[in-house]
Amino acid sequence: MPRRPLLEFEKPLVELEQQIEQIRQLARDSEVDVSQQLHQLESLAARRRQEIFQGLTPAQKIQVARHPHRPSTLDFIQMFCDDWIELHGDRRGNDDQALVGGVGRLGDQPVLLIGHQKGRDTKENVARNFGMATPGGYRKAMRLMEHADRFRLPILSFIDTPGAYAGLQAEEQGQGEAIAVNLREMFRLRVPVIATVIGEGGSGGALGIGVADRLLMFEHSVYTVASPEACASILWRDAAKAPDAATALRITGVDLLELGVVDEVLEEPSGGNNWAPLEAGQTLRAALERHLGELLALSERELKEGRYRKFRAMGRFVEGNSQNPGKID
C-alpha cells in the first residue's frame, strides 16, 4: 500500500506505490537483492509525480495545502528550534490550542514563533478546532507579539487555517474585534515580522497574524479572501463550482507574487511538502534566515514605514487610458 494518503489526482501513482511497497517487503523478508528494481520504480514514480505536480490547477493546490500529512507549525518549529519553549494563555482565561506560540532560536537569533496548528487525526483536529482560532487565540498571539516587541525579538508567524472560527460563542467574545486589534497593533511593532503561509491562508483568520514585513508562501499553499467553496456558494449558490471560484480568486503563489501580495514563493519537494518534510523545513529555514538578516539591518522607523507602505499598496486599482495604454488616468 502507499506510504501515505494519495490525493485524487495522484491516483495514477497508486499501482507504482503498491509495487514499490511489495518490493520493499520482499527485501525485508528475504536475502534477494532487489535494489536495482526498487531504484528504477522509485525513479519512475518520482518522474510521474513531478509531471503531475507541475500542472496542478488552483483547486488541486488546495487539496495539497489541506493534506493531513503536510508539515504543521509545530513540525517546522521542531525542525529548526532546539530550545523551543511554548507560552500559553491570553490572560483572560483562554488558551486556544488552534494557535500556538513561544520563544526559541533560529540559529543564534532569539525569536518569537507563532502559528495556526491543525491536528493529524479527528481527535486532535477537534482539540485544535481544525486550525480555526477563537478570539482567545488571536489575543494570545497579540500578547506574545507585545512581549516580543518589548524584548526586541523578531517575530516569525506560520499561517495554516481555513479561517477564524465563526461559531456563535466566538462572535459573542468579539472575533472581529480581536482580529482588528491584531491588524492595528502589528503595524506598530518595532521588530521584524516574517509571515509564511505553510498550508491554507484563509480570510481574516490568516491576516490576524499575517501583517508582516515579508510574506512568504510555499509553492502549493493558498492564500485567499474566502474559501472557494464559500465563494461558489455565495456567487453561484452552488458549492460544486468551487474549482471555478478557485481559479477566479487567484489564490496560488504565482498569482499572488504577480499581484505583489507575497514577497517570495518557496519551492516544494516533488509531490509537495508532505512527501519530504525535512527538505521543506530546510527550504523554509534558509528563506527565514535570509529575510531576517535583511530586516535586522533596518531601523525601527524603516520597518514600520515599509510595512505600512506594503499593505497600502495592496488592492490598488489604476485604470489605463484606452486611447493610450501607456498613459495612466
Curated annotation (Swiss-Prot):
Q: Where is this protein localized, as stated in its record? A: Cytoplasm
The GO biological-process annotations, alphabetized, read as: fatty acid biosynthetic process; malonyl-CoA biosynthetic process
What is the catalytic activity of this protein? Answer: N(6)-carboxybiotinyl-L-lysyl-[protein] + acetyl-CoA = N(6)-biotinyl-L-lysyl-[protein] + malonyl-CoA
Pfam families, per this entry? ACCA (PF03255)
State whether keyword Transmembrane helix applies. Answer: no
- Pathway participation: Lipid metabolism; malonyl-CoA biosynthesis; malonyl-CoA from acetyl-CoA: step 1/1
Keywords from the named record: ATP-binding, Cytoplasm, Fatty acid biosynthesis, Fatty acid metabolism, Lipid biosynthesis, Lipid metabolism, Nucleotide-binding, Transferase
User: Which ranges carry the CoA carboxyltransferase C-terminal domain?
Assistant: 40-294
PROSITE patterns recorded? COA_CT_CTER
A single GO CC term for this protein reads:
acetyl-CoA carboxylase complex
Does the record carry Disulfide bond as a key word? no
What are the protein's GO molecular function terms? acetyl-CoA carboxylase activity; ATP binding; carboxyl- or carbamoyltransferase activity
EC numbers, comma separated: 2.1.3.15
What the entry lists under InterPro entries is as follows:
Acetyl_CoA_COase_a_su, ClpP/crotonase-like_dom_sf, COA_CT_C
Gene3D superfamilies given for it? Answer: 2-enoyl-CoA Hydratase, Chain A, domain 1
This protein's assembly is summarised as: Acetyl-CoA carboxylase is a heterohexamer composed of biotin carboxyl carrier protein (AccB), biotin carboxylase (AccC) and two subunits each of ACCase subunit alpha (AccA) and ACCase subunit beta (AccD).
Relate the protein's function as given in its record.
Component of the acetyl coenzyme A carboxylase (ACC) complex. First, biotin carboxylase catalyzes the carboxylation of biotin on its carrier protein (BCCP) and then the CO(2) group is transferred by the carboxyltransferase to acetyl-CoA to form malonyl-CoA.
* Family statement drawn from the similarity comment of this UniProt entry: Belongs to the AccA family.
Q: Which named protein is this?
A: Acetyl-coenzyme A carboxylase carboxyl transferase subunit alpha
- Native species: Parasynechococcus marenigrum (strain WH8102)
Q: What would be the name of the gene that encodes this protein?
A: accA
